[in-house]
Amino acid sequence: MSRSQKNDNFIDKTFTILADLILKFLPTNINAKKAFSYYRDGMSAQSEGEYAEALANYYEALNLEEDPYDKSFILYNIGLIHASNGEYVKALDYYHKALEANNKLPQALNNIAVIYHYQAVKASEINDLETAQALFHEAAQYWKQAIKLAPSNYIEAQNWLLSTGRL
């Protein structure tokens, strides 16, 4: 039984039934349907903090999914898990892969900026000011791209860019 079929609450059960019906009648190939099922199970596991299970499902979905747009969200979610686990290099790699598949993914741009900003703050704390400035610059570049795609989002980033003279 897939994870999504084990949901307890009414909303999750309703969503699962509707998603299963859509999958059943959607005119798409079997691999795309399987990929979506793994993706959905990955999201469910991720929302419950079951990151190992989520990653296993996302990797299965990634192997089956052919559509670059859909693949970008799988890659993005893998990046989220690595970032949550403090694996920032891996997270950056997956966010960049997500952007290669779909360059209009502001949340990936934002998360890359957040990681660079975090690393810049850490570099500042140990007085590595040259590295800090380079990382702050990278963060600014990614936030500018994210804001360009989603102007009403990332207000804190916009304020930081303004207050530091980067916007």
UniProtKB/Swiss-Prot annotation:
Record keywords: Chloroplast, Membrane, Photosynthesis, Plastid, Repeat, Thylakoid, TPR repeat
Keyword Thylakoid: yes
Membrane topology: Peripheral membrane protein
Record SUPFAM superfamilies: TPR-like
Gene Ontology biological-process annotations: photosynthesis
Coiled-coil portions: none
Cross-referenced PROSITE patterns: TPR (PS50005), TPR_REGION (PS50293)
UniProt-listed InterPro entries: PSI_Ycf3_assembly (IPR022818), TPR-like_helical_dom_sf (IPR011990), TPR_rpt (IPR019734)
GO cellular component assignments: chloroplast thylakoid membrane
Residue stretches of each TPR repeat: 35-68, 72-105, 120-153
Subcellular location: Plastid, Chloroplast thylakoid membrane
Its biological purpose: Essential for the assembly of the photosystem I (PSI) complex. May act as a chaperone-like factor to guide the assembly of the PSI subunits.
Family the UniProt entry places it in: Belongs to the Ycf3 family.
The protein's name: Photosystem I assembly protein Ycf3
Taxonomic source organism: Galdieria sulphuraria (Red alga)
